């Protein structure tokens, strides 16, 4: 017999431990752009882009306001002849005669002053609210666009006239006035394009990393 021989049966193996729920591991995902580091040269170039755009926009707006504000031309015409003596009258064209041109000068002057002020504030490293600056950039861009559009409509009327309303063109008599006004309009539209680029760059930098 086994008991008599001193042999003992091995104890049965212990029952398997109940399976516990697998521990959930939480992994934190970091944005893909947080690990990317741009080189210092690229960072400096990216930081320099808004400054260059703003400076160019201020220069374009200031040039447009100055050229339009100084735009004036006189034209002398014979209106009657008394005997052998002609009677002449001098006509003068200047920007203050047209409300659209006055608005154009004011809008461009405001845009130039605003951009210069923002550049000076950033140069002195004072704290400025970025959201406020972005909103003001959009307001100034809209102001520039409306001023340029209003002046362009009046410039087209002065160049081609309106046959139905019997408004004769005036650029055939005030050619220099119209040419300088056209140069001011071109500078203003350049300022609008630069402000648009500045707003797009600001939106891209705010949405990106």
Curated annotation (Swiss-Prot):
PANTHER family: CASP-LIKE PROTEIN 1U1. Residues 1-39 are annotated as: Disordered. Keywords: Cell membrane, Membrane, Transmembrane, Transmembrane helix. This is CASP-like protein 1B1. Homodimer and heterodimers. Belongs to the Casparian strip membrane proteins (CASP) family. Pfam families: CASP_dom. Residues 1-10 have a biased composition (Basic and acidic residues). One of its GO terms (cellular component) is plasma membrane. Residues 19-32 have a biased composition (Low complexity). It comes from Zea mays (Maize). Its main location: membrane. The keyword Transcription regulation does not apply.
């Amino acid at each position: 017999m086994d008991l008599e021989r001193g042999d003992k049966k091995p104890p049965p193996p212990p029952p398997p431990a109940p399976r516990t729920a697998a521990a959930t591991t939480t992994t934190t995902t970091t944005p893909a752009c947080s690990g990317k580091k741009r080189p210092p040269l690229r960072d400096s170039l990216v930081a320099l882009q808004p400054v260059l755009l703003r400076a160019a926009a201020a220069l374009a707006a200031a040039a447009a306001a100055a050229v339009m504000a100084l735009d004036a031309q006189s034209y002398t015409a014979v209106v009657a002849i008394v005997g052998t003596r002609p009677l002449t009258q001098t006509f003068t064209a200047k920007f203050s005669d047209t409300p659209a041109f006055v608005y154009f000068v004011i809008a461009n002057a405001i845009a130039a002053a605003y951009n210069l002020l923002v550049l000076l504030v950033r140069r002195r490293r004072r704290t400025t609210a970025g959201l406020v600056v972005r909103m003001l950039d959009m307001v100034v861009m809209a102001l520039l666009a409306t001023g340029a559009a209003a002046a362009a409509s009046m410039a087209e009327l002065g160049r081609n006239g309106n046959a139905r309303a019997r408004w004769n063109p005036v650029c055939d008599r005030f050619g220099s006035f119209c040419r300088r006004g056209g140069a001011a309009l071109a500078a203003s539209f350049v300022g609008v394009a630069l402000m648009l680029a500045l707003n797009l760059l600001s939106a891209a930098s705010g949405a990106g990393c």
